[in-house]
């Protein structure tokens, strides 16, 4: 152990004594809980920095300075110790490492590989924390959070750069990820797709105007194709039970009997890309293939009535039953109801319930005939007739995908709530904040990491990413995980798993947050 390491150890012991005095000294007897908690947090961060610095110093101490052999058989002599900075959650720390060199061959730093350091200075933990914040918050807000909680200054440029680098392995991660165990899957395999516009920065114009003209915008939108695949258990419903749920009417006795708890998607995977419909659906088909098999009894493809998307869904998933998202179909009924009765008419809801029941009962052909006849009746205003004709035409074109009575009887989903929620939460809530403009590459990187987070793959992906990076940088396997981290985790887990652990320490368990509002909070069990 060098004198530097010994000095750091002495400083750590002094700081620990200060910590004890901070919570038990005379001043602590007059302090508030808030003062002690805040002070402890800052002092523990400082102590963590010293402990991590000691770790680096001791690893450098034990690192041999004897000449090393390269993979090619060349010998490199010890040249000097060289410093690199390490930006950790505790702040900026120096790492001194022995550097080995031979003229004409270059140099190597074995300690970098042993510590599994990346190419830049940011620690993996700091990267993962900032990126996890970044996939849900604007980048400058992420920087504010890091500054407020950890006292760190991480620029938006650094956050964006780290996300771009760490998103590079997402595609290869999902390519190697095994399909779920069939025993954990349900019998209905469901695919969904929809598009959502993302505001992009324009290509640099030769002479940007000082003031925009009427109707001009500073950016343009490009469609992000959002896809999802999951399995779900069959849930038989009646048209009436769906109407009762959708319009929050008092359910009939038969409807109550046929209203079990809602089935939930199993192993849902979502994805979004600006590479186009074909690229998105090709990838979706690749995801679907290993999940299909004898355990799957039904295959369902859900999307809205956008004809180009429907054609592609039929092309890429020919063995799936294409279903028009019922919510989209019902929106056309709402437009007719508003045109005929007005938004404030007391009978509008009753009219909607009546025609919704007809649609769900697979009587859409009758609805089409009624609307077409009304569209020719001159007693209705021109705008009313136009809306009737528009809806009749929409239903006529989508009639092959609107056999809802059969779908409900088989227990199939009839609404693309998963993908609608993904478009809103996954894309819009992050990419369409006020004044936000993206480069295509920047938003692709964000959406990749956001998919990893939303799919519940965050920790597993970053382990994969670190292994891939290590092979690229050092051409060797990632170091085996030492028991240190596992020991810390197990010690913490063993404390948490004891039923009396919290109560014996006078602690109440922290309540889990509620599920995010989304598909499962829809009034319609679809």
Regions found by a protein language model. Name each.
Residues 56-119:
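An N-terminal low-complexity regulatory-tail signal and nearby short nucleic-acid-interaction modules
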Residues 1-57, 97-526:
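Catalytic center-proximal scaffold of phosphoryl-transfer enzymes
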């Amino acid at each position: 152990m060098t004198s530097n390491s010994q000095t750091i150890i002495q400083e750590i012991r002094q700081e620990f004594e200060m910590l004890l005095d901070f919570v038990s000294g005379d001043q602590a007897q007059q302090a508030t809980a808030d003062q002690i908690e805040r002070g402890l947090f800052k002092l523990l961060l400082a102590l963590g920095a010293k402990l991590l610095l000691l770790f680096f110093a001791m690893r450098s101490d034990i690192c041999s300075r004897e000449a090393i052999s390269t993979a090619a058989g060349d010998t490199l002599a010890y040249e000097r110790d060289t410093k690199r900075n390490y930006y950790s959650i505790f702040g900026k720390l120096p790492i001194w490492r022995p550097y080995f060199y031979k003229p004409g061959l270059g140099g190597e730093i074995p300690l970098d590989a042993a510590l599994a350091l990346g190419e830049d200075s940011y620690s993996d933990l700091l990267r993962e924390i900032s990126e996890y914040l970044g996939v849900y918050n604007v980048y400058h807000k992420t920087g504010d959070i890091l500054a407020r909680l950890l006292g760190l200054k991480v620029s938006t440029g650094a956050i964006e750069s780290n996300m771009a680098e760490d998103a590079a392995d997402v595609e290869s991660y999902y390519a190697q990820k095994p399909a779920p165990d069939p025993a954990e899957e349900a019998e209905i395999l469901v695919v969904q797709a929809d598009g959502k516009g993302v505001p992009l920065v324009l290509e640099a114009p030769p002479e940007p105007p000082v003031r925009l003209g009427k109707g001009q915008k500073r950016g343009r939108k490009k469609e992000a194709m959002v896809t999802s695949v999951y399995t779900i258990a069959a849930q038989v419903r009646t048209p009436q039970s769906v109407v009762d749920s959708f319009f929050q009417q008092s359910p009939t006795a038969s409807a109550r009997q046929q209203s079990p708890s809602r089935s939930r998607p199993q192993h849902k995977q979502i994805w979004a890309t600006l590479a186009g419909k074909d690229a998105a659906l090709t990838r979706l088909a690749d995801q679907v293939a290993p999940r299909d098999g004898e355990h799957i009894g039904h295959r369902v493809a859900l999307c809205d009535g956008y004809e180009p998307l429907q054609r592609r869904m039929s092309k890429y998933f020919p063995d799936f039953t294409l279903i028009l998202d019922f919510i989209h179909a019902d929106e056309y009924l709402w437009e007719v109801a508003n045109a005929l009765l007005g938004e404030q008419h007391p009978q509008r809801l009753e009219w909607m319930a009546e025609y919704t029941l007809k649609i769900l009962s697979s009587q859409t052909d009758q609805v089409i005939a009624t609307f077409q006849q009304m569209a020719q009746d001159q007693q209705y205003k021109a705008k009313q007739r136009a809306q009737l004709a528009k809806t009749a035409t929409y239903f006529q074109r989508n009639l092959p995908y609107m056999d809802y009575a059969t779908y409900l009887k088989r227990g199939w989903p009839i609404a693309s709530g998963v993908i609608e929620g993904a478009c809103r939460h996954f894309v819009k809530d992050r990419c369409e904040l006020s004044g936000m403009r993206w480069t295509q590459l920047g938003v692709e990187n964000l959406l990749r990491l956001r998919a990893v987070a939303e799919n519940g793959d965050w920790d597993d992906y970053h382990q994969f990413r670190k292994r891939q990076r290590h092979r690229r940088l050092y051409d060797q396997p990632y170091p085996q995980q030492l028991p240190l981290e596992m020991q810390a985790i197990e010690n913490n887990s063993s404390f948490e798993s004891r039923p009396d652990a919290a109560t014996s320490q006078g602690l109440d368990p922290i309540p889990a947050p509620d599920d995010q509002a989304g598909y499962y909070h829809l009034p319609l069990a679809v």
